[in-house]
A protein has these predicted regions:
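Hydrophobic N-terminal alpha-helices or hydrophobic patches in metabolic proteins across all domains
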Residues: 7, 12-149
């Protein structure tokens, strides 16, 4: 389907070549917000630090996990944290790590467009590790921030 046009619908679904390829369940993003609201973020790999097993890989953003949660690898749910003053959930990265035989979902919080791309590049190390970026249509906290900012 190279060259096929993609369409994003108001319900958040995405179609490619006329076929729906991505659609979220109603309430999905709100459930993610609830998980975040009840979890503390622990940063164990600050921006600029080296990966413990691959020293040439340097973390472009703060990277950590949500305390009290569990991901597919048995560890806490992974998070990338950007520098935006509004720290809402912007997107997800679905990562396939072929050498480990793992698939994980990583949360992107408060990232600028450039920071989102940095996290995507870090997680995409073809051909062994590949990532899919799933953007949130609108981050509620950013919408609220914009609305409150306009009334001042």
């Amino acid at each position: 389907m190279d060259g096929a046009a993609s369409v994003c619908y108001t319900d958040g679904s995405i179609a490619l070549g006329g076929k729906t390829v991505l659609k979220s369940t109603p309430g999905f993003w709100q459930a993610m917000d609830q998980l975040l609201a009840h979890s503390k973020i622990a940063i164990d790999r600050p921006r600029g630090s080296q990966h413990p097993r691959y020293p040439k890989m340097v973390y472009p953003l703060d990277y950590g996990y949500l305390e009290g949660t569990s991901a597919m690898d048995g560890e806490g749910v992974d998070v990338w944290v950007g520098t935006s003053p509004v720290n809402g959930l912007d997107a997800l990265l679905c990562v396939v790590d072929l050498p480990k035989g793992e698939v994980e979902v990583k949360l992107l919080l408060g990232g600028t467009e450039g920071e989102t791309q940095l996290a995507l590049q870090f997680q995409s190390q073809p051909p062994l590790m590949l990532a899919l970026l799933v953007r949130r249509k609108e981050t509620p906290s950013k919408k609220d921030s914009t609305e409150s900012g306009s009334s001042q």
